[in-house]
Regions:
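Proline-glycine-enriched beta-turn/loop adjacent to the NAD(P) cofactor-binding site
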Residues: 16-21, 74
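Residue-level signal for the nucleotide or nucleotide-sugar donor/cofactor binding architecture
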Residues: 43-49, 107, 122
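Short, amphipathic alpha-helical "lid/cap" segments that border enzyme active or binding sites
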Residues: 48-56, 125-128
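Mid/C-terminal beta-alpha module of Rossmann-like enzyme folds, strongest
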Residues: 52-109, 137
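Glycine/proline-rich active-site loop of Rossmann-fold NAD(P)-dependent oxidoreductases
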Residues: 5-9, 20-36, 41, 49, ...
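Amphipathic terminal alpha-helices
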Residues: 103, 109, 122-138
């Protein structure tokens, strides 16, 4: 409320784990090839370039008042769909609609995408599946 009364534009951006996914083999992504066994192995991520473009989008398109936002890649770091992991953990829970956003990512960043017209560009899981990463990162 103070931000709005004072005519300020404040965007509090919550970022997940960020990495630059160096292509020199220093990052170990071998966990993407094995089954996910616990919820702790699921993780949201964001490539550092996408983080930079998110901040730029917020700076270039200010909105009045204060808003908090989640910003992340559209999927979780696992080689299995989050819906499968949730179904195994809670087999009696009713089936969720395929369009439910949380099936793709543990956090939802729809508000940031809508307000600023932003979308992440780097999908590390897709790059891994296409063997587009450095061999020591597979």
């Amino acid at each position: 409320m103070v931000a709005e009364r004072q005519g300020l534009s404040i965007a509090a951006i919550r970022l997940p784990w960020m990495s630059n996914w160096r292509l020199d083999g220093r990052e170990d992504l071998s966990f993407l090839d094995r089954p996910t066994e616990t919820a702790y192995e699921l993780g949201t991520y964001l490539h550092v370039r996408d983080g930079a473009t998110a901040f730029a989008a917020a700076l270039l398109s200010p909105r009045p008042g204060f808003e908090a936002y989640n910003v992340m890649a559209p999927n979780a770091l696992t080689n299995r769909p989050l819906a499968d992991v949730l179904r195994e953990a809670h087999p009696t829970y009713p089936k969720l609609p395929a369009s439910w956003p949380a099936l793709r990512c543990p956090y939802v960043d729809t508000k940031f995408r809508t307000h600023f017209g932003w979308a992440p560009q780097v999908d590390i899981v897709a790059l891994h599946q296409q063997n587009a990463l450095h061999p020591t990162m597979r």
